[in-house]
Regions:
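Catalytic lumenal/periplasmic loop and adjoining terminal transmembrane helix
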Residues: 6-124
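Core SAM-dependent methyltransferase catalytic element
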Residues: 120-141
């Protein structure tokens, strides 16, 4: 019984080790993909000036952790684009903006640049840069 129990124990350890290696490979692959996507987003946004707000509309964890980490000098606004108080801001949203919403902003004097689906860490979102084409006083009238 002693030798068969030892062999069974060694076999169990080998199976668990094999499963652990497989889990590590899957996790590492996911981590690498997230890192590539995060770097792409960070390179696109760069270092925004302090008056540029970061507006997030319900993207999980983005508004209260991730954006504060990457953009500590910028104001983070949790809400939709109507709650931005700056005349230029990055808008992170879980769903693409409707054509009507974009047209409404353009009609109100804003330029809307659509960067499509992006990602920070494990959090995907649609990214827009919105800025007033008119003077700031016009932009505040939304």
């Amino acid at each position: 019984l002693g030798l068969s129990a030892q062999l069974l124990f060694v076999l169990l350890l080998l199976v668990m080790f094999g499963m652990g290696i497989q889990n590590y490979r899957e996790s590492y692959g996911s981590y690498e993909q997230q890192k590539v996507e995060t770097d792409k987003t960070l390179d696109l946004i760069g270092t925004p000036e302090e008056d540029v707000q970061m507006v997030t509309n319900g993207v999980k964890h983005l508004g209260w952790t991730v954006l504060y980490y990457y953009y500590p000098d910028n104001e983070i606004v949790n809400g939709d684009y109507n709650q931005a108080e700056s005349d230029r801001f990055w808008y992170f949203t879980p769903d693409a903006m409707s054509d009507e919403a974009v047209a409404g902003l353009q009609q109100d004097g804003y330029r809307v640049t659509d960067y499509g689906q992006m990602q920070l860490a494990q959090y995907p979102f649609y990214l827009y840069y919105i800025e007033a084409v008119q003077p700031a006083s016009f932009a505040k009238s939304r």
